[in-house]
Amino acid sequence: MFDAFINGRLSKDEWTHEAHLITCWVALQGRTPAEALSLLRDSITTHNCGVGTPNTDTSGYHESLTVYYVTAISQISHLPSADTLASPHCTREAPLQYWTKDVLMGTPARLAWVAPDVAPLPWAPVLDQ
């Protein structure tokens, strides 16, 4: 799946939440979290363009969610991918433990890292270094 994603062969329908998580897990293998974040940021925006999903302030790439999942998965990336996918930090709803939906789905959080407004993350977020 990672190769299909990186090489532009993953369809829009195949780009599910689980596909995002697996891609993130693979990106973290042999890379620092900051390197994985950079790779994923570029690859997701490119993928979105390739499948007709515009990267705007209301759709496409979401920086705060990407930072959240790279950070969460980097804490457990030494585990097999199936265990990572089963982590409570990797569910679709997990970020809502830390952000209100309005803040997380708002334009500022989509375009740049926005710190949580409900509770602090249990780990320091992976940001560009």
Model-derived regions, located:
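A charged, amphipathic interaction segment
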Residues: 60-129
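Conserved, aromatic- and glycine-enriched, well-ordered alpha/beta core segments
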Residues: 7-82
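Intrinsically disordered, low-complexity serine/threonine- and proline-rich regulatory segments
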Residues: 1-7
